[in-house]
Amino acid sequence: MAKKSSIEKNNRRKRMVKNAAPKRERLKAIIADKTLPMEERFAATLKLAEMPRNSSATRVRLRCELSGRPRSNYRKNKLSRIALRELGSKGMVPGLVKSSW
């Protein structure tokens, strides 16, 4: 089990990304628009740089929903390999069958 502070920090980042996403998208669109004057684009770059670092989606870590494990996660299930194996052996993941040949 991961530290609760690490899990909570990641959840806080997720909330911050969700709240700041529209503003970041607007600023990025202004920066990418080559028809606008350079001063306006540079001002948008400065505003984007002033925003909190944790409002960037890159800072969010994919963690297991059950254990909070930060590594070896399946994006589709949002579970770590260990949690997926445990749930699969209990028959709680539909379509997951133990391999044998």
Curated annotation (Swiss-Prot):
Belongs to the universal ribosomal protein uS14 family. InterPro entries: Ribosomal_uS14, Ribosomal_uS14_bac/plastid. Binds 16S rRNA, required for the assembly of 30S particles and may also be responsible for determining the conformation of the 16S rRNA at the A site. Residues 1-10 have a biased composition (Basic and acidic residues). It comes from Bradyrhizobium diazoefficiens (strain JCM 10833 / BCRC 13528 / IAM 13628 / NBRC 14792 / USDA 110). The keyword RNA-binding applies. Coiled coil: none annotated. GO terms for biological process: translation. This is Small ribosomal subunit protein uS14. GO terms for molecular function: rRNA binding; structural constituent of ribosome. Keywords: Ribonucleoprotein, Ribosomal protein, RNA-binding, rRNA-binding. One of its GO terms (cellular component) is small ribosomal subunit. The keyword Transmembrane does not apply. The gene is rpsN. SUPFAM superfamilies: Glucocorticoid receptor-like (DNA-binding domain). Residues 1-23 are annotated as: Disordered. Part of the 30S ribosomal subunit. Contacts proteins S3 and S10. PANTHER family: 30S RIBOSOMAL PROTEIN S14, SMALL RIBOSOMAL SUBUNIT PROTEIN US14M.
